[in-house]
Amino acid sequence: MEAHRLNSTWEIVKLPPGQRAIGSRWFMKVKTNADGSLDCYKARMVAKGYSQCPGFDFKETFAPTVRYSTIWIILAIATLEDLELCSLDISHAYLNGKLEEEIYMRQPEGFKVGGPDYVCRLKKSLYGLKQAGWVWNKKLHSVLLSMGFERTQSDHGLYIFQRDNIHIFLPVFVDDLTLAGKKGTNFDPFIEELSSHFKLCDLGPTTQLLGLEIHRDCTNLTLSISQRQFITNLLQDHGVQDCKPISTPLNPGCCLSTSMCPQTEAEALEMRQYPYISIVGSLMYLALTARPDIAYAARVLARFNSNPGPTHWQAAKHVLQYLKGTLDHKLVYKAFQLI
């Protein structure tokens, strides 16, 4: 709430006749570091944007974010050219954008000012609003352009700075920014300029990027990408952290088919108690980011998302057992192999 007060996110006013106020709620989150250790507890007040009306209190909603394919290319270039990587985090990012629409919101639970007719008239964007991402991206885009960065046409989540023999890549994912430049590049002027516009946290050399764990060996010029912590959390969430490790994603000769799907409503109802779709979604994410070795298994399992049977469920658990035994598998970039 102190952040909202300092930011002048809203002002308390009496709800005008004919206007309606959307709701608000508290969202609690435990933030962890790359190794799974506790970073901090976060309490975020969000607007109930699902009650907004299109064309009335919001118009645009789209906000670009950097693609994983772009990240892989940048990491490959960083390995080949021995670039320095520096991570930045913008605190309370969505609170920086100014709203164009007139939006009223009921006061947060536990913080009441005035009578029952008094509400918050939003002056700045807020988490939960339909247009929050678009408003924030518009603000960040204008700041980066003023600093001399240019947005690439191939990926609107990637900015490039080229001036006075200084070349910097800047991939943007909402409020997470990464600076990539040649060794010896002084990032301080860029960080100071960003700090004059936003509350910024300099996280130092990049060890985590879009959930990917980054490990660098500057002596041997290698960079590796892993998802150990994500896999550990996945196993714990589904209660199989102590499962027996196995060596293959699917059983040799495994052939899943629709004939193994439930044939009656009772059988389908029985299968709904298992988090099949949740697990397959996590496997698809892993296959896309850092574990291509499970791509085939994840794709096969995804074919039966609408009506999985017991055999499909056992196959999904089989992949989890494989991940248990391959926690430390990494994608490794080697500079001499990229030439």
Model-derived segments and spans:
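Long, low-complexity, charge-biased intrinsically disordered regions
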Residues: 1-339
